[in-house]
Amino acid sequence: MYQLKARCSGLADLMAKPKSGNGISATARSAVRKIVKYDLFGYQDFEGNKYTEKGIALEEQAIKLSGRKRGLALKKNEERRENDWITGECDIYIPTRKLIIDTKCSWDIGSHPFFSDEAEEKAKKAGYTIQMQ
């Protein structure tokens, strides 16, 4: 029997509240449909763009800088972790410290959050706060 398994990066969409009433939101319904299409047929409507390409290209540098700021020698996590309901692959995982870090690279100076409240708001809006729980 098929059992849906969500990616951590998609949890915010799955947990979106409906605009009115109770039940499942249109955003959550759409997210479930995307997961099922991928699981059953390998279909994915988003395969990246210039923003994700830049993030991938700068990922190693972002990990090194994150480590420098924390005084740690960090390296890219290559292991996907999962349980019965969710799956995900974080950028950095340090089990001895119970530390998970997911780096993000801004596209340009206009999209970079310079202030902590701005960074927190962007993370919340993008669903990263749910993803990292």
Task: List each language-model region with its residue ranges.
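Mg2+/Mn2+-dependent nuclease catalytic core
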Residues: D45, K50-I56, E60-Q133
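Charged, glycine-rich intrinsically disordered N-terminal tails and low-complexity linkers that flank
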Residues: M1-A57
